[in-house]
Amino acid sequence: MADQLSNEQISEFKEAFSLFDKDGDGTITTKELGTVMRSLGQNPTEAELQDMINEVDQDGSGTIDFPEFLTLMARKMQDSDSEEEIKEAFRVFDKDGNGFISAAELRHVMTNLGEKLTDEEVDEMIREADVDGDGQINYEEFVKMMMSK
């Protein structure tokens, strides 16, 4: 997967890797990963950091080396393609283009897809995705809903 990256991308990722690799030993530890993530406003637990490292740690060293980091970044870039698909899907649901999906818009699209839903079922779908409780689904809520499927 990492072999699909351009030289420019690889050198950008090398730079990013160096930012993570605080002590310059060629690997990223959970401690280093945590430091960088906290500097980006995230607050991962030790277990989450370990999971992130284990996901790409192919040689079982408990750390991420540069080839493993490239694999991780290549995966993330592939995932961003699906982000474009999610944006497209949101636009399909958001008939009036106001940035929100209302119950009526959701019902309309589901009916067009051949799903016969009761008002209660549509309301339930909205309720499940509607994190801020305003009765409609905004883009962030839609992304969360799609990513959790």
Swiss-Prot record:
Task: Tell me the superkingdom of the source.
Answer: Eukaryota
Residues the record lists as binding Ca(2+) 1: 21, 23, 25, 27, 32
Q: Where does Ca(2+) 2 bind?
A: 57, 59, 61, 63, 68
Q: What Gene3D superfamilies has UniProt attached to this entry?
A: EF-hand
UniProt-annotated binding residues for Ca(2+) 4: 130, 132, 134, 136, 141
What InterPro entries does the record point to? Answer: CALM/Myosin/TropC-like, EF-hand-dom_pair, EF_Hand_1_Ca_BS, EF_hand_dom
* Recorded GO CC terms: myosin II complex
**Listed SMART domains:** EFh (SM00054)
Ranges for domain EF-hand: 8-43, 44-79, 81-116, 117-149
Q: What does this protein do?
A: Calmodulin mediates the control of a large number of enzymes, ion channels and other proteins by Ca(2+). Among the enzymes to be stimulated by the calmodulin-Ca(2+) complex are a number of protein kinases and phosphatases.
Would you identify the family this protein belongs to, as annotated? Belongs to the calmodulin family.
Q: What is this protein called?
A: Calmodulin
User: What are the leading ranks of the lineage?
Assistant: Eukaryota, Discoba, Euglenozoa, Kinetoplastea, Metakinetoplastina
